[in-house]
Amino acid sequence: MEEKRYLKRKEKARSDGNRDQVAVSCNQLGDFYNQQGKYTDAVREYVQEAQIYASMGKELETAKAKRMVGEMYTLLCDYDAAKDHINDYLKIAKRLKNQVEEQRAYATLGRVHLLHGQSLADSSASGSMEQLKLAEKNFLRSLLLIKDLSGQISKLEQLDMQARCYLNIGVVKEHMEAFQESIEYIDKAIKISKTHELWDLTHLCYISMSLLYICKKNDATAALRFCNMALEVAKRFPNKVKKICETLITKAEILIKAGDFASAKQILTKAYKKNTPDENDRVNIEKQLRIVVKVCQTLDELVLTSSVDYAKLKGLYEKLGDGCCHLMNYEKALTYYQKMLENAELNQESGKSLVPIYVSLYQTYRDNGQFDKALEYLWKEFELNQDAPSEAFTTLCTIAEICEQQSHPFWTVHDVYQKALRQADKAGSCSDKLVKIAMVRLRRLMLKHNMQVLVENLEADATAKGIDLDQEESVGDDEEESDGGGTAVQQNTPDWDDDFDLATLTDSDASDLDETEKPRPQRTTRGNRTLVIKKNNKGETQLHQACISGNLELVRRLIDQGHTVNVRDHAGWLPLHEACNHGYREIVELLLDKGAASAINDKGGTSCDGITPLFDACSNGFLDVAELLLDRGADATVRTDYNETCIAGLDKWRQGAQLVDGEQAQYAQLRERLLRTLSKVGICSDKNARPLTNFNAKRISREERGSMSEEEDEEEALHESNRRSLSHNRSGSEYGAKKSKSSTQPSASKEYRSVMAHLKRPNRLNDDPPSTSTLNKHKRNAFLSEDEVDADNWLIDDVGPERKRKRINSGDLSRRTSKENFQDTALSLPANWEDDLLQATPENEYSQRQKQMRKLTLSRSSSMSSNHSSSATSSRKKHQATLLDSGFSRFRSESPLGSESSQDGTTSLISVRTIEPDSTTSTIQVLISPAKSSPIKVQATPVLATTVSFKVKIQDELLLVPIERKKLQDINIRWLAEEAGRRYNKLTGLTPLLRLKTADGFAYEETDPVSVALEQNMLMASILDWKISPLSQRYEEMCLQMQKTVDNKVKLLLERSQNNNMLELSGLWMRAEKTEPIFKALLHQARLTVLDLSCNFIGNEGCQQLAKSLPTLLQLKALRLQCNAIGSHGLEALLCGQGMDKLELLEELNLNQNPLGNASVRILSKYCASPAGQALTCLQLAQCELTELQDFDLGFNKLTRFDISFNQLTQQSVRRLTDQLNSCRLEQLNLSYVRWPLDDASGFALSERLVTLFEGGTCERFVGVQLAGCGLNDAHMYNISQHLAKAKQLQMLDISDNSNLSGTTLGYILDELPQLRDLLAVNCTNLLDDIRLQKLEQLKQLPRRLELTVDEQVFSMPGALETLQSIWQLQFGDKAKMLTTSNSRKIGRRYKGLLKLLADGSDAE
């Protein structure tokens, strides 16, 4: 309808001759088609618009229309056309000197290059990188222009442009795999957009960061954190439902990839029930949700299935694997399929029954890019299918396809197809069809490898069988797909998208309990009085507060009066979370009965780190609460956003607890219950197999703490500030429960002990149970009276919600945003009670209190509210606001103040509370009189903290250095730098020499007092040098630390390296466990220039160890890892590890004789393109199982020494290699034995490429050239020798195993290359004949070393070898020697074999 209206307007404008209106109509139609996804139609309209404006001379409008044409072509993936139109747009903008449009043009052009680079990522690595660099260049130009736009556009538009440029550059850096730079740029975009409330852009940045962490860094925790932030921003939009659903889709995908299907189900159900207006998103959500629901149902069934019912377990694991494949979580699918195979074997299944499992495994390994494993299971399937020729044929065709895809040698793939043909001949009725398919594919393979002779033979065979291969080529693929392995896939994969009533999902699946957006149910009671649900400034309702304080009766009354059960505070916590976190089992049970069961697996709001009530209970040691939740249906498989399971939280609590036998048994029983559930669904690892005891919990805790100082404990508390748990003293609670209920007035001794306990642990929960006298004294009404409501703590929020602080972890301190309860008790103590207390307090206890006070000041974990007084007469009236509402919190001060005498001469005691301030206030002490419940009116005096902590950043470590306030003027910056270095040493074992700077880079003098840095939020430390022990001493220290034996031979070599900065550990055949202390000792040995580890067995594991130290060897120029059993995974860990960009001087990389495989080529390309690879000039890859170099660039153009010998390269790879190598720079080149297959055609093609290589440059720098086994002939060698004649420093030439060479070549070499010292021509039997022997006599200069294969039968004259020997001795004197490899001449036979002619016999090997 809308389209017709636009078309009608366009026709009317055209008939009226109004070209302006026609252009406007074209623009409107183009926008309409763009929104509908009809990009071709949009292009047509925008082109018309541009033509009309161009004919009218309106250049700016023409430029804008061309930009839209370019954007449409971009969406159609026609990037070249898009670039043409946007470049036109850019030219017009420049001509008009319109900087705003010029900036937009550069940004648009950068986006086209970015998308083009993404599209080339899988096909052409070099092309992709080129496009990404162009994108970066254009985005940077766009960024530079923004600064010149001041005054032309508003400040907000300018900032929006700047932030978008930073985001775009960040995305480019992500695709260039410069992840750290990408994060830095996106962070800049986030800061600008958040500061200036550009929420749409902020949301986009958070989503980009989330995808970066999950897709590139595989860090689900960070990805979820950014996703949660995006979710908070999405709630600000007018179209928030659409944005929220988009964000929830991303969050669900992250959880699916992490294998947390229960959490993904909650998120997708929430998204489904929001009913996004975007149809594509709605279909995607529904499809994903159906699959996830079925996976969760299968997991539930799996938990209930007997562990010996192998047949049922096999079926369930198969369903789970299929579901994970549909969700594209192939890693998890492989885990389930392996378990399926295990259960099939336990069920005594064998033979054909295993085929579906092998099919599932190979398909999934193939989808996951693990082709070697896929081939392994394909061959197993083939072994079982040999009696079924058609199935065996399909399997072999798949094997050949994968081998061809992985660039396996031609003959390997050829042999597989030959086997397939033999199986096709046995296939009976479908034999002809299968033979056609095999022949078509085999012919395609031969043509790809230029096997013309084989193609002709195959076509002749096909013709003899009545098959026209040209005709069958077009239909071969269709028949293959219809008759191939598709049936097996369909049988193996159930229909996961069949009908399932999503409306049956309950609210418990939705986890969408944000009651603030829904009308609250209000219950009308007698007298039309209703319960008004109020929230304090933390968002806590009366029910939250009652659950925190453990008031069961109040909880029951609030619910009966209509209080919503599932209501969130500002941070996202439910009352159920609070009750579980504080361990009130009766309250938990009541809440579950009254409607909280729907939220039993709730993960809180976006600020709650995905913590469920069950995790709350487990991590705080409330075992009975955890058992209750499990009995009522809590899902133990739900993980937090930090990927922690309930069992991990339980074990973390157990490490800090001492349990008696009964408690230990309860803990072990609960743990076993959780472990049984988690292990069945494949979550728990073997390390969690045994429960902790008091003994090993202490040991583990000691190992984790190690040698941490008090201040490091504070650092740990800050580091864990985003986590939370409630410290709970179990023994104290039990003690409190045993007290006599009738005793309402404690004795003085008990009061004294209570005071001492609070002084020692000011943050500890009150262990005494709340007094029940008041509750028993009065009969409760059905309603809350005005006096029963703690009016001081309730303030109607008319300012807007204050973000509730996240729960934090501070060791033994409370790590919860909920308020702690303290009773303020009037103590009847003597007048000199202060002196007695101070004398009774040991010095170490005082220091312990100081430490805890510092922790409280640092963490400021929560605002802690007071309980009602236990006195029946204490009541408070409602005031407008209280200190607590202003953000203050309370805990007991470390020491009481002195008493004051009353007017009548009696002594009255004043109890003291220190109210912890927020960031804008000082500490306030409030004095409480025993005779009154209200504070005494005294002047509040600020009390400064006794210590000041400086934050210092050293590389990637953040340190806190506390200093007593009174010493600030006596300590200088030098002391602070030394102390920070000492603490860094405790963390890493290395001591740096530091210079401290401000955050913006201004350096302090060493003599400056430390007080000048008080205003700095963080100090940056630059490392001037390292205090490092000699390498051999470091090795001994590492061996001692790791409890390994010191190898004296290694130690001696390490000592030698100190003299020449070259560490040579070649030929020791050490494995990874032996090299680990060596690699740790290498950390920060910055003067080391050469590291030679040739001929060891470090493998991939050793590479991971070395990768930690390698970036710190800043002067390293040569890394030799020849013959170390290193694969592609080890190479990736080594070259793509964090910090490798700092290794900017590495010139030589020797990886010879390692099974790297083709997968390593991408890794090497990435490394060579990085800053660390820019200095690389020597690359050695001999015998590394390489066959296909694809389009990757290993920095060939800048190499001076290159060795890729003994790798069977394809002709296409050789062509690309010779095109990229630079003969102007090369000094050493080894291309021996790289051709494949070994036929005349490939030899000729390789020789032609070699000639092209030498012709492409000056060849002046060559010192050594090795071309053995390259299929060279005389013509090729003539051309090559002509070019090598320019290399005046040429020392060695190896042309061995080129059997087509004749004596003519030897003549060329001796004439053209007189500077040659070594000539190797082994197995070139036709090289030396009578003519060449005479030529040798005439030459004045010969190579000093000549290795030839000689056949005396070639010579017509007798005594050819004697003549040769005399020539040699005449040239080089008595030291010259001729060596043979057999004694045939001594027994009168003619000699045939290797002949070595040496100028100096002492050089003989």
Curated annotation (Swiss-Prot):
Compositionally skewed regions (Low complexity) per UniProt: 859-874
A molecular function (GO) term: histone binding
GO CC field: nuclear replication fork; nucleoplasm
ANK repeat spans: 538-567, 571-600, 609-638
Residue windows of the LRR repeats: 153-181, 439-465, 1085-1108, 1113-1137, 1143-1166, 1186-1211, 1287-1311, 1333-1357
Repeat region (TPR), residues: 23-56, 63-96, 163-196, 203-237, 245-278, 314-347, 355-388
Biological-process GO terms, alphabetical: chromatin organization; double-strand break repair via homologous recombination; replication fork processing
Alphabetical list of SUPFAM superfamilies matching this protein: Ankyrin repeat, RNI-like, TPR-like
Superkingdom of source: Eukaryota
Feature: compositional bias, Basic and acidic residues: 813-822
Record field: compositional bias (Acidic residues): 469-483
Protein name, per record: Tonsoku-like protein
Species of origin: Drosophila melanogaster
Lineage: Eukaryota, Metazoa, Ecdysozoa, Arthropoda, Hexapoda
